[in-house]
C-alpha cells in the first residue's frame, strides 16, 4: 500500500489470551499486516469473527468435530476453514514473515518446526515446545536461517537485557515469579486449595491452565528449562526470585558484577509488541510505570517445599535428553486431573514426579534421539503413566 510492504503474519492460538492480545495490536495498525492464518480451539465463534475481521486466508480449529460449525460461521466470507493437526502444519508452511505460536501444550511443536523450516520468524509463546524439544527447535532455526523470538515476559526481558552483550559474559540469569495465587497461604492450607482458588491470579490476566500452573510454580519450572534451552546457559546459572509486584520481569548478571534488569507493567502486550516489531520499538498501548508511586520493590527466595516444581526443573535439566518432554507431558496430565476434580492441588507435583520416574526407568527411552516422533511418543507415555498412578490412587 503506497510502497509499504505489508507484513504477512499468522497467529496460532488466536483465541487464547496471548492470541487475543496479539490481535489487539494488529487491530491498531490493520494496514501494516496481511493475516495468513488464525487457529483456535473450542471457541469457534471468536475464531470466525477474528478471521473475518482481519481478512485471514484460512481459519483452523484444532478440533475436527467443530469444523462444520466453523465453516458455517465463515460462510460467504471468503475465509477458508480447516481443522486438525495436519491443517495446522499445512498453514505453518504457507509463506509468512512472522508467526505467533501461542498454542498451549505440546501441540504447538509440529507447526512451530514447520514454520522454522520455511525460514519464518517464530514468536514463541508456546514454552512447551522449548521444554520438550529445545535442541530440535534451535537446530532447525539455525539450519534454515530462521529466528525464534521469545514471547514469555521473562524471556523477552532477558533477550532485551542481552542486546549488545555476549552470552559468555553472563554470570547468571534471574527470572521472577509472582508466587501465584497461594504465595502467602500457609503450607497446610494448600492441601485443600480449590480449582476456583487456583484459577485466580493476583497480577496477570491469563487463561485457566497457565494461572493454575502459576499457583503451583509449574509455569516457572517450565520457564527455567526454557531459559536454559533458549540462551544456552548452565542450569546452575539460572535463578528464580519471588517478586509479588510482577514489575521486574528478569535480571541478567554479568561477570563484572553488573545486573541489568527489565521493568514494565504486567501486560503481555509488552513482550508481544517487542517480538512483533523487532528489531524496532514501536509505541504500545500499555501503562507506564510510576516508580515514585510504586516506592518499593519486593523480592524473596522461593520456598522449595511450597514449590516442588522448581526442584523438578533442576532435575530435568541435569538429566537432559527427552526428560523435558516427559516432564511436560506428566505435568499437563496431572493438571487435567486437578481440573477434573480427581486429585488435590498438591498431588500435581507428586504425580508429575512419579510419571517422570516411570519413564526414566525404561531403558533407552529418555536418551533416544530428539525427533518430533520421539518427543510425541514420550509425551504420550508420560500422560499414560500419570493416568495409571491416578487410577491406582483413586481406584
UniProtKB/Swiss-Prot annotation:
Q: Where is the signal peptide?
A: none
Recorded catalytic reaction(s): these are: 2-C-methyl-D-erythritol 4-phosphate + NADP(+) = 1-deoxy-D-xylulose 5-phosphate + NADPH + H(+)
Molecular function (GO) terms listed?
1-deoxy-D-xylulose-5-phosphate reductoisomerase activity; manganese ion binding; NADPH binding
Q: Which cofactor does it need?
A: Mg(2+); Mn(2+)
Highest taxon listed in the record's lineage: Bacteria
List ligand-binding residues for Mn(2+): 152, 154, 223
Entry's family note: Belongs to the DXR family.
Q: Where does NADPH bind?
A: 15-18, 41, 43, 126, 128, 207
Q: What function does the entry list?
A: Catalyzes the NADPH-dependent rearrangement and reduction of 1-deoxy-D-xylulose-5-phosphate (DXP) to 2-C-methyl-D-erythritol 4-phosphate (MEP).
Q: List each coiled-coil range.
A: none
What cystine linkages occur within this chain? none
Which pathway does the record list?
Answer: Isoprenoid biosynthesis; isopentenyl diphosphate biosynthesis via DXP pathway; isopentenyl diphosphate from 1-deoxy-D-xylulose 5-phosphate: step 1/6
Q: What InterPro entries would the database entry show? A: DXP_reductoisomerase, DXP_reductoisomerase_C, DXP_reductoisomerase_N, DXPR_C, DXPR_C_sf, NAD(P)-bd_dom_sf
What are the alphabetically sorted keywords of the record?
A: Isoprene biosynthesis, Manganese, Metal-binding, NADP, Oxidoreductase
GO BP: isopentenyl diphosphate biosynthetic process, methylerythritol 4-phosphate pathway involved in terpenoid biosynthetic process
- Record protein name field: 1-deoxy-D-xylulose 5-phosphate reductoisomerase
Cite the binding residues for 1-deoxy-D-xylulose 5-phosphate.
127, 153-154, 178, 201, 214, 219-220, 223
The record's listing under Pfam families reads:
DXP_redisom_C (PF08436), DXP_reductoisom (PF02670), DXPR_C (PF13288)
Membrane-spanning parts = none
- EC? 1.1.1.267
Amino acid at each position: 500500500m503506497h510502497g509499504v510492504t505489508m507484513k504477512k503474519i499468522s497467529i496460532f492460538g488466536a483465541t487464547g489470551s496471548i492470541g487475543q492480545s496479539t490481535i489487539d495490536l494488529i487491530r491498531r495498525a490493520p494496514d501494516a499486516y496481511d493475516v495468513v492464518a488464525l487457529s483456535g480451539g473450542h471457541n469457534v465463534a471468536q475464531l470466525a469473527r477474528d478471521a473475518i475481521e482481519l481478512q485471514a486466508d484460512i481459519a483452523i480449529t484444532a478440533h475436527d468435530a467443530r469444523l462444520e460449525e466453523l465453516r458455517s460461521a465463515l460462510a460467504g466470507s471468503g475465509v477458508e476453514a480447516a481443522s486438525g493437526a495436519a491443517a495446522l502444519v499445512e498453514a505453518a508452511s504457507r509463506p509468512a514473515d512472522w508467526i505467533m505460536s501461542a498454542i498451549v501444550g505440546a501441540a504447538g511443536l509440529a507447526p512451530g518446526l514447520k514454520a522454522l523450516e520455511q525460514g519464518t520468524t517464530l514468536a514463541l509463546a508456546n514454552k512447551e515446545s522449548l521444554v520438550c524439544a529445545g535442541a530440535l527447535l534451535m537446530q532447525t532455526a539455525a539450519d534454515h536461517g530462521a529466528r525464534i523470538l521469545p514471547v514469555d515476559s521473562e524471556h523477552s526481558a532477558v533477550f532485551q537485557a542481552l542486546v549488545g552483550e555476549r552470552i559468555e559474559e553472563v554470570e547468571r540469569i534471574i527470572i521472577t515469579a509472582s508466587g501465584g495465587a497461594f504465595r502467602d497461604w500457609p503450607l497446610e492450607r494448600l492441601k485443600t486449595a480449590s480449582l476456583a482458588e487456583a484459577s485466580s491470579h493476583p497480577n496477570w490476566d491469563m487463561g485457566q491452565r497457565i494461572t493454575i500452573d502459576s499457583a503451583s510454580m509449574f509455569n516457572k519450572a517450565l520457564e527455567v528449562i526454557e531459559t536454559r534451552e533458549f540462551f544456552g546457559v548452565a542450569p546452575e546459572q539460572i535463578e528464580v526470585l519471588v517478586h509479588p509486584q510482577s514489575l521486574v520481569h528478569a535480571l541478567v548478571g554479568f561477570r563484572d558484577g553488573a545486573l541489568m534488569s527489565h521493568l514494565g507493567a504486567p501486560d503481555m502486550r509488552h513482550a508481544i509488541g517487542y517480538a512483533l516489531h523487532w528489531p524496532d520499538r514501536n509505541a504500545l498501548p500499555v501503562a507506564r510505570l510510576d516508580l515514585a508511586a510504586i516506592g518499593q520493590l519486593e523480592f524473596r527466595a522461593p520456598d522449595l517445599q511450597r514449590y516442588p516444581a522448581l526442584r523438578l526443573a533442576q532435575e530435568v535439566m541435569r538429566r537432559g535428553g527427552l526428560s523435558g518432554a516427559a516432564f511436560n507431558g506428566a505435568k499437563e496430565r496431572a493438571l487435567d486431573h486437578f481440573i477434573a476434580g480427581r486429585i488435590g492441588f498438591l498431588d500435581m507435583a507428586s504425580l508429575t514426579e512419579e510419571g517422570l520416574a516411570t519413564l526414566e526407568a525404561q531403558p533407552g527411552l529418555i536418551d533416544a534421539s530428539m525427533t518430533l516422533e520421539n518427543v510425541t511418543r514420550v509425551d504420550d507415555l508420560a500422560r499414560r503413566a500419570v493416568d495409571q498412578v491416578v487410577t491406582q490412587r483413586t481406584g
